[in-house]
Structures are given as structure tokens and as C-alpha cells.
Amino acid sequence: SVGGGTQEVSQGLVKAMNYARDGETHIIGVAGRDGGALAIMADACVVVPEPADKSLSTPITESMQAVIWHLLVSHPALKRQKTAWEDK
């Protein structure tokens, strides 16, 4: 959810976060707008500021999500195996 979800609109997201919380796992996320339920429930949440042109909110937030997830999965401390281009 670009906006981080609400109990009414993003029931699946909220349910997944409740499930994670019940399983004693950490919740991290990246959301736009005000961060919604994700910003409230997450242990760590990057909230991407809403641009002046609100029509760009979704593409900018999703772009930032992609950058942050890529940084996470590529971080040496978190990687479990080399990426394909590192084997060449």
C-alpha cells in the first residue's frame, strides 16, 4: 500500500501486520503520504514525503520502495548468496 493502509481499505495489510506482531517478528516498511497503519504498527517505517504534485505520490513512493528494498537485499550482512552478476 503506497499510503501505508488503513483498517478499512487495506484489511489484508493490517491483518498481515497483526499476524507478524503475534508471531513476535519485526515489521519494517516504506510508505508514502502519512504512512497510515504501517507507520503506526511498524518497528521501523520510512515515510516518503508527499510531493507537491500529488499525482506523483504513487510513482515516487514505489520508486523509493524499490531503492530501499534493493539496498536491504544487497547489503553484505543480509545476503545469503551472491547475485548472478557477482559470479562473473
Task: Locate predicted features.
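Basic, amphipathic alpha-helical segments enriched in Lys/Arg and hydrophobic/aromatic residues
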Residues: 88
